[in-house]
């Protein structure tokens, strides 16, 4: 008998038709990268994936964070005969100390002499005969579900042996995006959600030294590292933004400051994406959450983008976003009290319904191309693996 980890990938991958093999290969590649310093063996048994290792806890901790993996199951491998299956099933039920149970069988090996229903009945009957009045069958609400997978070998486990994973699609299968990362709660969640859909994720942070401290920058670097735990690696570009902000403050109306700054952030992200061959922009904006995130404000920001702008949080409540932040371990870092460039120089009464034509007129006073290029030329680059 061997204890193995059964890897179940997202059902969405099954629907990829002729591209299914590409997604499977990428997912296997990503799993192997996560386990590069853990001794392990990858086993395929009739289209099921298993991992064998002396460090099962270490494997579980890493693989459950691989995008595309839906669930992990700690299974016991036995010989593919009924006697071995029933004995291991009895052992699992005894260990569970449950008062009721149900058996579910998946017989992929069609050479096995019993079908799935017959195996479930026979294993259940054997357990009842051995445990007598200690336990009963409950097919609707059992305390313990016993699962039997019959392939080349047989694999037995219970619902207590299941570990939920992150799901999604294999990282790197769906293009690339530049996430406008701040030190807040929202943008790290947006980065995570895009990565979860298989999008290669890069980040840009706008740093307003000396108005924002080095601790604010360190906070954003830490957020990028946390998101990077779910990806192969993550790159953070730190762009100096003070000169742009001061020029806007000097030459533009106060109520237009926020939206013009947002337009410059979008321009910088687009130009940086062009240089790095990144296909899209992602922000952590949610409709109506703050004054600049009205429908009109978002349209005015989009106006300066030359590529798709994704907003994965657009219809989410703040509480929902905070829940995800807690789940992915960014929340405690995000709430550290260090200001970013979005929280300084905020006008008392920002425009909530800006118009593109008004912004174009206001920006004529600014040397847009020179400001954008200078900021990018002076940026810092950090790579976290």
From Swiss-Prot:
It is an enzyme of class 2 (transferase). GO terms for molecular function: ATP binding; CCA tRNA nucleotidyltransferase activity; tRNA binding; tRNA-uracil-4 sulfurtransferase activity. Residues 57-160 form the THUMP domain. It catalyses: [ThiI sulfur-carrier protein]-S-sulfanyl-L-cysteine + a uridine in tRNA + 2 reduced [2Fe-2S]-[ferredoxin] + ATP + H(+) = [ThiI sulfur-carrier protein]-L-cysteine + a 4-thiouridine in tRNA + 2 oxidized [2Fe-2S]-[ferredoxin] + AMP + diphosphate; [ThiS sulfur-carrier protein]-C-terminal Gly-Gly-AMP + S-sulfanyl-L-cysteinyl-[cysteine desulfurase] + AH2 = [ThiS sulfur-carrier protein]-C-terminal-Gly-aminoethanethioate + L-cysteinyl-[cysteine desulfurase] + A + AMP + 2 H(+). It is found in: Cytoplasm. GO terms for biological process: thiamine biosynthetic process; thiamine diphosphate biosynthetic process; thiazole biosynthetic process; tRNA 4-thiouridine biosynthesis. ATP binds at residues 180-181, 205-206, 262, 284, 293. InterPro entries: Rossmann-like_a/b/a_fold, ThiI_AANH, ThiI_fer, ThiI_N, THUMP_dom, THUMP_ThiI, tRNA_STrfase, tRNA_sulfurtransferase_ThiI. Pathway: Cofactor biosynthesis; thiamine diphosphate biosynthesis. Its EC number is 2.8.1.4. SMART domains: THUMP. Keywords: ATP-binding, Cytoplasm, Nucleotide-binding, RNA-binding, Thiamine biosynthesis, Transferase, tRNA-binding. Pfam families: ThiI, ThiI_fer, THUMP. One of its GO terms (cellular component) is cytosol. Its main location: cytoplasm. Catalyzes the ATP-dependent transfer of a sulfur to tRNA to produce 4-thiouridine in position 8 of tRNAs, which functions as a near-UV photosensor. Also catalyzes the transfer of sulfur to the sulfur carrier protein ThiS, forming ThiS-thiocarboxylate. This is a step in the synthesis of thiazole, in the thiamine biosynthesis pathway. The sulfur is donated as persulfide by IscS. Belongs to the ThiI family. This is Probable tRNA sulfurtransferase. It comes from Clostridium perfringens (strain ATCC 13124 / DSM 756 / JCM 1290 / NCIMB 6125 / NCTC 8237 / Type A). The lineage of its organism: Bacteria, Bacillati, Bacillota, Clostridia, Eubacteriales.
């Amino acid at each position: 008998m061997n204890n193995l980890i059964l890897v179940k990938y997202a059902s969405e991958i099954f629907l990829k038709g002729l591209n299914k093999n590409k997604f499977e290969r990428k997912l296997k590649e990503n799993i192997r990268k996560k386990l590069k310093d853990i001794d392990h063996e990858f086993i395929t048994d009739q289209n099921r994936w298993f991992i064998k290792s002396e460090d099962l806890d270490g494997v579980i901790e890493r693989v459950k964070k691989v995008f595309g993996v839906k669930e992990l199951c700690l299974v016991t491998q036995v010989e593919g005969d009924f006697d071995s299956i029933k004995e291991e099933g009895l052992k699992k039920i005894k260990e569970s100390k449950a008062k009721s149970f149900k058996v579910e069988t998946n017989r992929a090996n069609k050479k096995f002499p019993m079908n799935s229903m017959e195996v479930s009945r026979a294993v259940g009957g054997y357990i009842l005969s051995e445990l007598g009045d200690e336990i009963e069958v409950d097919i609707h609400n059992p305390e313990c579900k016993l699962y039997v997978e019959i392939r080349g070998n047989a694999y037995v486990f219970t619902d207590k042996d299941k570990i939920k994973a992150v799901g999604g699609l294999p990282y790197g299968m769906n293009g690339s995006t530049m996430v406008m990362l701040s030190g807040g709660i929202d943008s790290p969640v947006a980065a995570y959600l895009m990565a979860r859909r298989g999008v290669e994720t890069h980040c840009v942070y706008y740093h307003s030294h000396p108005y924002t401290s080095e601790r604010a920058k360190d906070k954003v670097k830490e957020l990028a590292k946390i998101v990077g735990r779910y990806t192969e690696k993550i790159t953070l570009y730190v762009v100096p933004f003070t000169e742009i902000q001061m020029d806007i403050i000097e030459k533009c109306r106060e109520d237009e400051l926020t939206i013009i700054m947002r337009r410059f952030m979008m321009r910088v992200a687009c130009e940086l994406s062009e240089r790095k061959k990144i296909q899209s922009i992602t922000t952590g904006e949610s409709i109506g959450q703050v004054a600049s995130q009205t429908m009109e404000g978002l349209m005015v920001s989009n106006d300066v983008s030359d590529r798709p702008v994704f907003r994965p949080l657009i219809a989410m409540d703040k509480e929902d976003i905070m829940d995800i932040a807690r789940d992915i371990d960014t929340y405690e870092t995000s709430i550290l009290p260090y200001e970013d460039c979005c929280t300084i120089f905020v006008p008392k009464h920002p425009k909530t319904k800006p118009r593109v034509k008004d912004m174009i007129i206001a920006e004529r006073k600014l040397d847009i191309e020179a400001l954008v290029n200078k900021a990018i030329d002076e940026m810092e680059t950090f790579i976290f693996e």
